[in-house]
Structure formats: C-alpha cells, structure tokens
Amino acid sequence: MSDTKRWDGPPVETWSMAWTPDQAAEALEGVAAPWAVAGGWALDLWLGKQTRKHEDLEITVPRAFFPEIQARLEGLGLQLFAVDDGQAIALEPGEAPGRRGFQTWAMEPAVNGWRMDVFSEPGDAQTWIYRRTGELSAPRAWASGRTPAGIPYVAPQIVLLFKAKATRDKDQVDFALIAPKLLPEARDWLAAALRIIQPGHLWIDQLSA
C-alpha cells in the first residue's frame, strides 16, 4: 500500500497570500451564515489592533451553513479543497467535503495562492459546541463578537481554549496578552473548561490567580 499523500493545491507557502479579515468580510458580505474569524486574527479583532503577523486566515461556521460559504467563495471564482491528514483534495463545485475532515481551504486560481481556511463546526446559529470533544457548549452570542465595522469573530476565551492544546510559542504570547484583559466571567469559564478537557494545564493556575 502506498503512503503517498495527495496534494492537489498550491504549496503551503502560498498562505502568504491569505486574505485579511477585512477582505474576508467583503467577500462574504450578505451571506447569512453565522461565520466568524477564528485564531490569532480573532484576538486582534477583539483587541482592536493587529499585534503580530498572521500565517493564514481562519473562519469558522456551523457545519449546516457551510454550503452558503462554499457557494459564495466558488461564486467568486475560488477553488475549495478538503484538507485532512496531510492531504489537500480538490472539490468539485458544490461538492461536500464529506468525511474528509473539518477543514476546507479556499484557493484563488488567478494567483495560485490560499486565501482562507474554513472550519466546519458542530452547533447551530444559536449554540456553539466545542468541536474536539463536544463536551462544552455556550450560547453563540456569548462565544462570538463583532468589531465596530461589523466583522464577526470568535470570542477570546474560545480562541484560547483551542490554543491551549499545543501551546506553541505564539499561543503562549497570545495568552499572556489576552488573559489579563478577559472579563472575570470569561476567565472563570476558560479555567473551568480547561479543567474538563486538559486537567493540569499550566494556564489554569494563571487564570485563577
């Protein structure tokens, strides 16, 4: 059996062409799906300023609403790829990613570069559900926010919850910057969530201090 991985898209290095949140919001203007910017960009949107360079642009959307995002991006001429287990498999227009994982990368053929990483999540328009285990949930209105310009983003306590898994250098920097600024309710929630999914995580004591 061959161990060759299938990679239909451009090199990963072309994520240097990723859209900014402003560009993503312009592309998705009028789409009713409850999407939101995720990852490090979401923290910067919450802060109201860019604090560091970002390697890509991630958005999240409940799985049931993914076809709306797909239709808009394909309508703009982008090609979508199901990405999982080191593979990037090109999707036909309107083709669902199926069981190929939760990540779909959007590439613009005109520049042969990646523009956006779309996470298909559980939950619905009213409820956010933690994708990795399903053990945690919260009202979507509490788990997200909007900039003054109307760009939706994942709330910082949710972003940090996902960043806690690997705790790369940039994740630790983000935590040190964001955690002291969280409201008490958000800090307490994040600490409690970590006790459930990652007991003993070094951030728990820092959040409780």
Please report, for each region that a protein language model flagged, where it lies by residue.
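Compositionally biased terminal segments of proteins
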Residues: 1-209
